[in-house]
Amino acid sequence: FRNLRRKEILYAAILLHDIAKPRGVADHEITGVDMSRIILNRLGMDDAVADVGFLVRNHLVMEQTAFRRNVHDPDTLKEFAARFPRPELLDYLYVLTYADLSALNAGVWTEWKSAMLQELFQRTSEILLRNLRGTEIDDYHHEKHEETAESVVDALSASLPRAEVERHIRGM
């Protein structure tokens, strides 16, 4: 939150992300984009319309991806990362998603949800900041997997024979 450059974008998105919900409209996030544009223009926040519109339109996507898809699957990450024209928008969406979910009631926000959301955020952030595309994401994912496997082998080799640990890890 502290690193967000324009907090007014986040505040506007928090206030407007469900603006079309009371109308009982299916796909309230789509209708909400038009409604938020009108409101922001009236408030003289023309320069925030595109970013707030993006956040309103996508405010359900991060939680749906984090909780219903495999955040370790490169295809999931490619699809999710492709939505973001700029890495900064991921930062805003992450905070908006957290605020939206944690505001519902105490039972909705769990450690598991927190972990899944953070995992999706971190993996996607790396992709966006490194400007990875297509097979570069696959290569990066494979490289990270190898690094993790190597660190597990190193840690377990302190108490077990290294060859046995490597054989087990490589067989997974």
Features from the language model and the residues they span:
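Acidic/His-rich, divalent-metal-binding segments that scaffold phosphate/diphosphate chemistry
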Residues: 1-28, 38-47
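Feature representing long, continuous alpha-helical segments
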Residues: 10-17, 30-34, 38, 50, ...
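Generic structural signal for hydrophobic core residues of well-folded globular domains
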Residues: 13-19, 23, 59-60, 96-102, ...
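Flexible loop/turn segments at secondary-structure boundaries
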Residues: 20-23, 30-32, 42, 61-65, ...
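A glycine- and charged-residue-rich anion-binding loop/surface
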Residues: 22-30, 47, 51, 56, ...
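Short secondary-structure boundary/capping segments
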Residues: 28-31, 69-74, 110-114
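Acidic/histidine-rich catalytic neighborhood
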Residues: 41-98
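Regulatory modules associated with amino-acid/nitrogen control
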Residues: 75, 79-172
